[in-house]
A protein has these predicted regions:
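Non-catalytic terminal accessory segments
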Residues: 1-115
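Short N-terminal secondary-structure initiator segments
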Residues: 1-2, 109-122, 179-188, 257-258
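Aromatic side chains
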Residues: 64, 69-72, 122, 201-202, ...
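A broadly tuned "polar low-complexity/structure-edge" signature
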Residues: 67-75, 119-120, 150-151, 340
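N-terminal signal-anchor transmembrane helix
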Residues: 78-139, 145-162
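Soluble catalytic domains of enzymes that build or remodel membrane lipids, polysaccharides, and related
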Residues: 128-343
Length: 343
């Protein structure tokens, strides 16, 4: 049932791709052979399906080509009672060139943006005594196997090692359904190069498969896997790692924090953002999460959370992730390593 639930939206999107792209190309390409309509539509479905499977940047182009055509058609429909405006819009998209050019520009920007991750820094003041600043390096949503990521991950290791961080956190969705075993093995070898004062930590995401084998590989790479656990780090602050909500095994914060010293800072790590109400009720100083990708594809960023939130007592940081899912483009926020200093 869940498979059907998630498959239907993708099927609708693919049909929209085929409809808009096919409709335009049938205008541009003259008929050359018998039954060319049927041949063309079948070929187009195969082409789009092939690019979805390979996760190429063309997927981004198809999304924007379809989206801008839908917006254009909606404007034409709304302006129908106003003949001059309607005629202007009709002339504006001369032979589809404007929408074609805009779609290409959005796609190129998304590719370049995905290729160049940035360091996003936050300085967080908490309402508890912090004798020395706590420095955290956090990444999530690598989705290893996405193009550009292998080289970027080498640069990431260098950045973390030069940053003099207290801890390094992997915030889930490190792998996904497309990650190969070779890519996983390479990743675990690179993880061994991470150097921080108090170690590296991992929480699982909704795309991760945390079986016994994967658990052991993280451990062998020097990474502590947190599954509904509370750790006291260096006798200075608590690190709370929760299982992902999709596992249906996540514990409530009230239960997890019942034996902690509430005079010390409490930092909650969870792949999907925790509810503000639960954070506030349990006096959590900071929660760090990912999952949303910052929307990844404009205008999805208007419908998800990203960045820093002051909830009152507690603070939240939601990362856009270090990688991309589904296709190697990002037209919303940058791919990022989140650098946090708590004082």
């Amino acid at each position: 049932m869940n498979y059907l639930f998630w498959s239907l939206p993708f099927l609708v999107i693919i049909l929209l791709f085929v409809f808009y792209f096919g409709k335009i190309m049938l205008k541009v390409l003259p008929p050359k052979v018998k039954n060319y309509h049927l041949i063309y539509w079948i070929s187009l479905i195969i082409l789009i399906g092939f690019n979805i499977y390979l996760r190429t940047p063309l997927m981004g182009f198809l999304i924007y080509f379809t989206l801008f055509h839908m917006i254009y058609d909606l404007l034409r429909l709304l302006s129908y009672p106003f003949k001059k405006v309607n005629n202007f819009l009709k002339k504006l998209n001369y032979k589809e060139y404007p929408i074609l050019v805009i779609s290409i520009l959005f796609t190129l920007y998304g590719v370049l943006n995905a290729m160049h991750p940035v360091v996003t820094s936050y300085n967080i003041k908490v309402d508890k005594q912090v004798d020395e600043p706590i420095k955290i390096a956090f990444i999530s949503d690598l989705h290893l196997g996405t193009p550009y990521l292998n080289e970027n991950f080498q640069n990431l290791i260098k950045t973390v090692n030069e940053g003099n961080y207290d801890i390094f956190v992997l915030g889930g969705d490190i792998f996904d359904e497309w990650t190969t075993e070779k890519e996983k093995e390479h990743f675990f070898e690179i993880l061994k190069e991470i150097k921080t004062k108090n170690g590296s930590y991992y929480i699982e995401g909704n795309h991760d498969v945390l079986n016994e084998e994967t658990y052991q590989k993280y451990t062998s790479s020097g990474v502590r896997v947190l599954q509904n656990e509370v750790l006291l780090i260096d006798n200075k602050y608590y690190l709370v790692g929760r299982k992902d909500k999709m596992t249906r095994e996540v514990q409530g914060l009230e239960q997890m924090l019942k034996n902690v010293d509430m005079t010390l800072p409490i930092i909650v790590l969870e792949h999907q953002p925790t509810s503000v109400k639960e954070l506030e009720e349990n006096k959590v100083d900071l929660s760090i999460s990912g999952h949303t990708h910052g929307g990844q594809i404009w205008p999805a960023n208007y419908f998800v959370k990203y960045g820093y939130y002051d909830n009152g007592y507690s603070k939240s940081i939601i990362s856009s992730g270090y990688g991309e899912w589904g296709m190697p483009i990002k037209t919303t926020y940058h791919s990022e390593l989140v650098s946090i200093t708590i004082y």
